[in-house]
Design a protein with these regions (language model features):
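FAD-binding core/adjacent interface of flavoenzyme oxidoreductases
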Residues: 1-12, 66-153, 157, 227-230, ...
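Beta1-alpha1 glycine-rich phosphate/pyrophosphate-binding loop at the start
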Residues: 2-78, 169-191, 411
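Mid-to-C-terminal Rossmann-like scaffold of FAD/NAD(P)H-dependent oxidoreductases
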Residues: 4-7, 27, 299-411
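N-terminal Rossmann-fold NAD(P) dinucleotide-binding loop
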Residues: 18, 163-164
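A Rossmann-like FAD-binding core segment of flavoenzymes
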Residues: 31, 79-99, 105, 173-280
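FAD-site-proximal beta/loop scaffold in flavoenzymes
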Residues: 127-150, 240-242, 247-323
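A short, polar/charged loop-to-alpha-helix boundary motif
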Residues: 407-424
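Cysteine/selenocysteine-centered motifs that mediate thiol-based redox chemistry or coordinate metal-sulfur cofactors
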Residues: 423-448
Length: 448
């Protein structure tokens, strides 16, 4: 007979969004019972070091943990690690979650913050030796260990944010790195061309082989039989990565960095609306009023553009988790407190990426943005900024990408995006690095 327990708040997913939801709940409700269920053996941890400090050895696994044990004790949170929610029954009487150990948990409100899993490509067998993804802390530890034990040649398939960061980190520790991308340039297609070309050149200057316009056709594990093949640690075989261009890249470790697939299956089976993520309103409530969502899996209406989209970045996970927690608690305690009015998502989507010494920041909704306005000059062979490209739409700035830019300029760019100011009369000042962007933004806002 299944064991049954009841909690007021069930947090499904063991990432940063669920962690911050604890803070949001406790800011409203100090007494409600909270259960956090995560499928990893680690408590919630920070993901940014996975492609950087963990790989270089500058950050330990313990240092990635977002909070110490006393945080969970102080907030009276029970944490179930290495456990999955396998089913949700959202019956009108009492919703029930079934856990992987057979336990049934009834709940008042739930947060669905399951994030996503690494996308595997057709050429790779998930059980294949010497082929890995980089999504979890255990993935990063395994990549680091493989390289440390002699896996000196690494092929990375996918040159987006994670692929580029991983390439820089592996090159830093002395690995021979090849970066393979099916698109014609590295980094996301929506990013400005000068930045994408600069990152490619920067990686190339540090010994990274960059293959763009090249998809992987197959892996040839008979590479060990060819002269010069290097075995993977533990005596397993090296690979040859055969590309669509006819090129062949030898590697004793292949890392797939092809983005993520949102973990929506359990929600979809339960009848929750799904569209490349959990569909929600601006209070982060899903199509079932008892279930909220946050983090990488949440498809949220953008606070500036209004477009519903997923944002797969740390800042968004923190903000949305905190907001969802507050709103869940306001909702559950509405009958006894005057805190029933939920807050709406009002976050300017931001991201950052550290590729070696390059620090890139971005904000806004860059879909269909025109990147014709640049502040500073960025040439592949030139200095790494400071430089900002502004994404334009109807004479307003809707997004930016900044490389090694001053904090004051970044703050000013965010103000211009949030306030949707017409900048058509000050484009020369926006471009001119001698004119403080904060002064330009301040003048526009003052004269609105």
């Amino acid at each position: 007979m299944a064991k049954t327990r009841h909690v007021d708040y069930l947090l499904i997913g063991g990432g940063i969004a669920s962690l911050r939801a604890i803070e949001g709940i406790r800011s409203v409700d100090r007494r409600g019972k909270i259960l956090l269920v995560g499928d990893e053996v680690w408590p919630p941890y920070n993901r940014p070091p996975l492609s950087k400090g963990i790989i270089t050895g500058e950050v330990s696994a313990k240092e990635t943990l977002a909070e110490r044990r006393r945080f969970y004790w102080r907030n009276r949170v029970r944490v179930r690690r290495g456990t999955r929610v396998t089913a949700l029954d959202l019956s009108p009487e009492m919703p029930v979650a079934t856990l992987s150990d057979g336990t049934e948990v009834t709940f008042g409100r739930a947060l669905y913050a399951t994030g996503g899993r690494a996308r595997w490509l057709d050429f790779a067998d998930q059980a294949q030796t010497g082929v890995r993804v980089l999504r979890t802390l255990d993935d990063a530890i395994a990549v680091r260990a493989n390289v440390a034990r002699g896996g000196g040649r690494v092929a990375i398939v996918g040159a987006g944010f994670i692929g580029a960061e991983l390439a820089a980190s592996l090159a830093q520790v002395g690995s021979t790195v090849d970066l393979i991308e099916a698109r014609e340039e590295v980094w996301p297609e929506t990013a400005p061309g000068p930045l994408r070309r600069y990152i490619r050149a920067w990686l190339g200057n540090r010994g990274v082989g960059v293959y763009t316009g090249s998809s992987v056709q197959r892996l040839d594990s008979s590479a060990r039989n060819r002269p010069g093949a290097v075995p993977v640690s533990g005596g397993t075989s090296a690979h040859s990565v055969l590309l669509s261009t006819g090129a062949r890249v030898d590697a004793d470790l292949v890392c797939v960095a092809a983005g993520i697939v949102p973990n929506t299956e359990i929600a979809e089976k339960a009848g929750i609306a799904v569209d490349d993520g959990i569909v929600c309103d601006r209070t982060l409530r899903s199509s079932d009023e008892r279930v909220y969502t946050a983090g990488d899996v949440a498809r949220i209406p953008d606070s500036v553009s209004g477009r519903s989209r997923r944002v797969e970045h740390y800042n968004s996970a923190e903000y949305s988790g905190l907001l969802a927690g507050e709103n869940m608690a306001r909702d559950r305690t509405a009958s006894v407190k005057s805190t029933a009015i939920p807050s709406e998502y009002d976050f300017l989507a931001t991201l950052w990426s550290d590729i070696g010494s390059l620090h890139v920041e971005s904000a806004g909704d860059d879909a269909n943005a025109d990147w014709s306005i640049e502040r500073g000059t960025l040439e592949p062979s030139g200095n790494p900024g400071p430089w900002i490209a502004f994404g334009m739409s109807d004479n307003t700035i809707v997004a930016y990408y900044a490389l090694n830019a001053a904090r004051a300029d970044i703050s000013a760019a965010q103000l211009l995006i949030r306030n949707r100011v017409d900048v058509s009369t000050v484009l020369e000042a926006v471009r001119d690095t001698a004119v403080p962007l904060s002064a330009t933004a301040g003048g526009l806002l003052k004269n609105r």
